[in-house]
Every structure is written in C-alpha cells, then in structure tokens.
C-alpha cells in the first residue's frame, strides 16, 4: 500500500511555472520570456490574465476572477508553421494551463519559436460564446549535447 501511495504521489508531482499575461490593446505580454530545451516535457505553464477587462456570463471580471464553468482552448503554431488546437479545458483558480508535452520537444524540427493563442469560452460545447486574447510565444532551444 505504501509503495502504491508513493507511486501515486510521484506521478502527481509536476514541474510548473506561473506567468502573468498583461493584455494592452492588441498586445499580450508575458511577465517573463518563456523558453525550454529540446527533450523537456511534463511542464505546466499556468497563465494569469492581467488588464483583460471582459466578463464571462456577465458576472465575473477576467481581470480579477474567471467564472466557474468557464473554459479555454489554445491554438499552437509550431516553428515549421504547422498549426494545431488543443481540446477545451476548464479554467481553474483563474489560471489558463498549457502543458509542454513530449511531442512538442522530441525532434530537431521542434526547435524554435512557438506561438500560443488562448480562446476563452463562457461554457462547454459548440454553443458557448468565445473571446480570443492576443498571442504570446515561447521558444524551444537546443541542448549543448
């Protein structure tokens, strides 16, 4: 039982970083430059929005709190120009979560600048209303060896 509990605890551990995204006019600026290295994965970036004064369900201001039941998705543009979208996920604790997965960093062609654009929804499903924030970027760098 102890080994099973220990394995479960280890599996739930993660590498994470909190970042504030400040929205001004048509520009989104992260609180710091984002980069990782080839082969890095299992990293959760948690983004907090600042100065984005829209409301979800006409009750909650995104600058201070995201409504329970709000969702987000993210469109990703890879260094080679390919674009894909991640499935919508619930917004928890006012944070947008983006996970660096192995498929983003496991190949030489993955090195370079990625662009992320988050879409916020007032609910789940195809009838949910949507607002999009300006894109931000991060870089995958090469290892020394």
Give, region by region, the residue ranges found by the protein language model:
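N-terminal assembly/attachment segments of tailed bacteriophage virion structural proteins
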Residues: 6-145
């Amino acid at each position: 039982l102890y080994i099973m509990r220990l394995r479960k605890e280890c599996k739930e551990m993660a590498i994470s970083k909190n970042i504030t995204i400040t929205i001004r006019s048509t520009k989104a600026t992260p609180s710091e430059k984002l980069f990782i290295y080839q082969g890095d994965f299992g990293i959760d970036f948690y983004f907090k929005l600042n100065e984005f004064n829209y409301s979800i369900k006409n009750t909650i201001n995104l600058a201070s709190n995201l409504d329970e039941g709000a969702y987000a998705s993210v469109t990703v543009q890879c260094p080679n120009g390919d674009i894909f979208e991640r499935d919508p996920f619930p917004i928890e604790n006012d944070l947008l979560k983006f996970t660096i997965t192995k498929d983003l960093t496991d190949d030489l062609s993955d090195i370079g600048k990625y662009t992320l654009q988050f879409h916020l929804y007032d609910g789940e499903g195809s009838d949910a209303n949507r607002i999009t924030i300006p894109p931000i970027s991060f870089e995958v760098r090469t290892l020394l060896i």
